[in-house]
């Protein structure tokens, strides 16, 4: 889709998505003053986890320094021709009494995604249902006695999430994906914010003394990670649509810290 960008030049835009296959630690590069020593990056206003565009662009470039890579991603002397936004959280997995886990989103996330897509010239159909308080629109697998029980929160089923699940599934997979169709839950903005603060993984890490195999002094720390199955959304902007091929050059990416212990494996989806 064309839009006017910068110096009135016609630009192309694409929406694409990242699905976490293992927990992801998009760190801030700073030690926190809270109990969690190494938190994930978050939006300042909402507190929702995100993957910074700089991290994503660096992984896509993957250390390449050839002229073609410099043209697309930039160099110290020139700006790259491919622009990426931060990858924002679209779906968050939360433990569910029925169906093992739910994939939750909220009206605020959907409204912001649609607003950004329209601003970038993308005309994509995405339902905008409303939900408040302790209500939920839910897939069949996560319902129990007309309720959805997420961790310690009981929500009353207002209706089905099928229409929304079909739309999101189409964006991500190009078809109806059964797991998403059965597990999608639209919760209120407040409930989504609550789980963004409390529903992430907190992992204790230690460093052992090689001789005694005991924890070294001061070598216990806690780090935060976005759980596996989470889905992030991102927009790409370029004058030449051929640059979008870089988004799918590899079907899987490793993003964030702790790669040596399996963190940060994501699958690239979409491209609409």
Named regions from a protein language model:
Residues 1-272:
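Basic, Gly/Ser/Thr-rich N-terminal segments that form RNA-phosphate-binding interfaces in CRISPR RAMP
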């Amino acid at each position: 889709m064309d839009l006017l960008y910068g110096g009135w030049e016609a630009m192309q835009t694409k929406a694409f998505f990242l699905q976490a296959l293992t927990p992801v630690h998009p760190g801030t590069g700073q030690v926190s003053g809270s109990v969690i020593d190494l938190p994930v990056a978050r939006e300042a206003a909402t507190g929702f986890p995100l993957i910074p565009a700089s991290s994503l662009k660096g992984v896509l470039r993957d250390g390449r320094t050839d002229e073609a890579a410099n043209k697309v991603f930039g160099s110290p002397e020139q700006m790259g021709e491919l622009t990426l936004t931060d990858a924002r959280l679209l779906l968050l997995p939360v433990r569910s009494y029925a169906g093992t886990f739910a994939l939750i989103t909220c009206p605020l996330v959907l409204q912001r995604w649609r607003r950004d897509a329209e601003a970038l010239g993308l005309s994509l159909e995405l339902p905008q249902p409303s939900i408040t308080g302790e209500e939920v629109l839910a897939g069949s697998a996560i319902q129990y006695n007309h309720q959805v029980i997420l961790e310690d929160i009981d929500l009353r089923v207002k209706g089905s999430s099928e229409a929304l699940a079909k739309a999101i599934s189409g964006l991500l997979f190009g078809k109806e994906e059964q797991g998403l169709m059965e597990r999608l839950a639209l919760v209120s903005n407040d409930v989504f914010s609550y789980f963004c603060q409390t529903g992430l993984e907190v992992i204790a890490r230690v460093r052992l003394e090689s001789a005694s195999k005991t924890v070294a002094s001061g070598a216990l720390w806690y780090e935060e990670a976005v759980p596996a199955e989470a889905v992030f959304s991102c927009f790409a902007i370029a004058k030449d649509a051929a640059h979008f091929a870089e988004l799918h050059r590899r079907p899987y990416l490793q993003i964030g810290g702790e790669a040596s212990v399996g963190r940060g494996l994501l699958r690239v989806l979409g491209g609409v």
